[in-house]
Structure formats: structure tokens, C-alpha cells
Amino acid sequence: MSLLDYFRSNKKQNTAQLAKERLQIIVAHERSSRGGPDYLPQLKQDLLDVIRKYVQIDPDKITVQLDKKSDELSVLELNITFADDKKG
């Protein structure tokens, strides 16, 4: 009977290890698909608030992207499409 218990407990360990590895893959995928650090949405909102003090902008016309170029260099890119003020 102890021989069967040995195989059963080993199978549970393997199942637990497999579940842990799958969960780590899912978490890593979710982190990479977010596209940026946790502070990026708040940074975007703060930048919008400051820019709105000076010009009228549409929040849907703004993109904020953080690109990691190397271990020491990240580039924050902010693109704003301003409304055309021309009347006519």
C-alpha cells in the first residue's frame, strides 16, 4: 500500500508544480500585455490635467506609450492631436 501512496503523492506534487508553472505563465503574459508600468494610467491623467489648463483637447486623441530601449533607457512618448481651430 505504501508503494501506491508514493505514486499518488508524487502525482499530486507534479500536478501542483504544473499548475504553478501555468499560473506563472499566465501572470507573465498579463503583465506583458498591459503594455506598461502600473503608474502609466495615472501619469497619463496627470498630463491631461496639466495640458487642459492651456488648450482644449479630446482625451481620445491622446496616446501615451512607454518603450524600453535597453536596461538603462526607457522612452516615454506622448502624442496629442489638437483640434483644428480654423473656422470657415
UniProtKB/Swiss-Prot annotation:
GO terms for biological process?
Answer: cell division; regulation of division septum assembly
Keywords, alphabetical: Cell cycle, Cell division
Q: InterPro entries recorded for this chain?
A: MinE, MinE_sf
Domain of life, source organism: Bacteria
Q: What is the stated purpose of this protein?
A: Prevents the cell division inhibition by proteins MinC and MinD at internal division sites while permitting inhibition at polar sites. This ensures cell division at the proper site by restricting the formation of a division septum at the midpoint of the long axis of the cell.
Q: Which family does it belong to?
A: Belongs to the MinE family.
> Which HAMAP family does the protein's record reference?
MinE
Name recorded for this polypeptide: Cell division topological specificity factor
